[in-house]
Design a protein with these regions (language model features):
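A glycine-rich dinucleotide-binding beta-alpha-beta segment and adjacent secondary-structure elements
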Residues: 173-186, 396-457
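N-terminal glycine-rich phosphate/pyrophosphate-binding loop and immediately adjacent elements
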Residues: 2-129
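Mid-domain catalytic core of redox enzymes
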Residues: 206, 236-348
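Extreme N-terminal leader/targeting segments of oxidoreductases
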Residues: 1-5, 23-24, 432, 483-487
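Rossmann-like flavin
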Residues: 99-192
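A conserved FAD-binding loop/helix module that cradles the flavin
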Residues: 55, 453-475
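C-terminal segments that line or cap access tunnels to active or ligand-binding sites in enzymes
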Residues: 305-408
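Helical element adjacent to the flavin cofactor pocket in flavoenzyme catalytic cores
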Residues: 198-245
Length: 487
């Protein structure tokens, strides 16, 4: 009889692993705590709108570029009715607001981007030229041969520099501000340049229908290959016998036996709860004690009874009056996304608008939601009001036009996904973390593996999906099977 593999978590890594394992002859059961697949790659419905939480740009969205064939294998680009997923590409990557009231458009055309930077800071012409050339090299490294890993490695090395250090190469204060306002100072430059570099090739677009539709497409393909999904099934612990993983126990006491267990769940929960901290090796101990994390978010979603096609899809406006959250953090900027380009997310003639504010102060939100639910809801309402007040100078008068308001917080992220500290993408992309290697297997425990954003610092959907594919290849190799991605 074929081996039975239990995959914990139906996020993109778990879905990918399940899909590739099934097409290689394994019986696969996915156990997921939520009622839907996708994990953090998700959307939800409110008042006729679909609120998208995850994808802003997706590498591999164009045929012939890296990751495209993997997404095709996974069924990500085929909708439930058999139609292809449309891809939205944009003339600009984003627009960044500056503290002096100016703004700069980061054009998707790298030549136009270069000219904009030269116009802003002619005194930095030499360094702007170097930046422009590095973007072109990075674009080429990821947009051609999907097996050019060596080229990618050496190209990326120059983009691992912390953004604070890189900004010092420029003398113009506004140009420095562009880099420093985009990323935390210790994050690697690659967090900005990778997505930006792919825009000329149209190889990092937005899949129409949003993040949950994208995840549902992958789950549907996996199910067609024979994968069994058990939703609303939180895992209490991984069962171990004689140093081997033999199954999982669910929170309701049910046992699911397995010949192999793959955890694509939150890494901290897997190591310290499901495995009771027994197999934490030095690499993971260091990671969870020292590595910085991606933040959590406060997201305000608005349904606006107006077509906002004339506004840019992505921007980070600057405000003199900061927004102060209940966690004590103060913010003069936020990420603004206008989804007028995706009519599947809003009723006809209307537009979904989302605002994201990053915060690492997750504990304050957990405490408020636990201690005083009424005050927690009042804080969400207050923040929505603050956001609307700041959006009106940008989008025009909104009175009487807002027919949906939804606010999610770090508490929401933890509640629905279980992600450690509410982080939306695991370990942050710094020079140290991106250079680190975290093992997929644990010493002293066989027939078990970990995958996903907590095993690959820097995160990202393509990385998660590739991680699932790679673990299937590893298991096939262990069992003497010839791996196939077809099916």
């Amino acid at each position: 009889m074929d081996k039975h593999i239990v995959v914990i978590g139906a996020g993109i890594a778990g879905l990918s692993a399940a899909s590739y394992l099934a097409r290689n002859g394994y019986r696969v059961t996915v156990v997921e705590k939520h009622s839907l697949p996708g994990g953090l790659c998700t959307s939800w419905k409110r008042g006729g709108y679909t609120i998208d939480y995850c994808i802003h740009w997706l590498m591999g969205s164009r045929e012939g570029t890296q990751f495209y064939s993997m997404w095709q294998e996974l069924g990500a680009f085929t909708n439930a009715d058999g139609s292809p997923v449309g891809i939205a590409n944009f003339d600009q990557f984003t627009t960044i607001g500056l503290s002096n009231g100016d703004s700069l458009c980061l054009s998707s055309d790298l030549e136009q981007l270069k000219e904009s930077l030269l116009l802003l800071a002619p005194e930095d012409a030499k360094q702007i030229g170097k930046f422009h050339r590095s973007l072109k090299r990075l674009a080429g490294a990821f947009s051609g041969n999907p097996f050019a890993s060596l080229v990618q490695f050496f190209t990326m090395l120059g983009h691992l520099i912390p953004v604070e250090e890189y900004a010092k190469r420029f003398t113009n204060p506004r140009l420095r501000e562009i880099f420093l306002s985009t990323l935390p100072p210790d994050w690697s430059l690659i967090a900005l340049t990778l997505g930006l570099s792919q825009q000329p090739y149209k190889s990092a677009g937005y899949p129409i229908g949003g993040s949950l539709n994208f995840a549902m497409n992958i789950a549907r393909k996996a199910a067609s290959l024979g994968v069994t999904f058990r939703y609303n099934s939180p895992v209490e612990k991984v069962l171990v016998s004689e140093g081997k993983a033999v199954g999982v126990q669910l929170s309701d006491g049910q046992i699911v036996d397995a010949d192999y267990v793959v955890s694509a769940a939150d890494g901290h929960t897997t190591l310290y709860s499901m495995l009771s901290g027994h197999y934490v090796n030095p690499a993971y101990k260091k990671a969870y004690e020292q590595y910085p994390l991606f933040p959590s978010t406060v997201m305000v979603a608005l349904g606006i009874k107006k077509d906002l096609q004339q506004f840019v899809h992505s921007s980070s406006p600057y405000f003199e009056e900061s927004i102060v959250l209940c966690d004590g953090t103060s913010h003069n900027s936020f990420s603004l996304n206008v989804y007028a380009f995706d009519h599947t997310l809003a009723p006809e003639g209307c537009t979904l608008v989302t605002v994201m504010i990053n915060t690492w102060e997750w504990e304050a939100w957990e405490k408020l939601a636990s201690d005083n639910r009424q005050e927690y809801e009042a804080e969400k309402k207050r923040i929505a009001g603050e956001i609307i007040k700041r959006l009106e100078p940008l989008l025009g008068p909104l009175e009487g036009l807002i027919d949906m308001v939804d606010v999610s917080t770090p508490h929401s992220v933890i509640r629905y996904t279980g992600n450690w500290k509410g982080s939306f993408e695991g370990f942050a992309p710094t020079k140290a973390t991106l250079s680190a290697r975290l093992p997929k297997t644990l010493d002293g425990l066989s027939r078990f593996a970990m995958i996903g954003q907590w095993t690959v610092p820097g995160g990202g959907l393509p990385t998660a999906a590739k991680d699932g594919r790679d673990i299937a290849k590893m298991i096939c190799k262990q069992d003497g099977k010839r791996f196939s991605g077809k099916g």
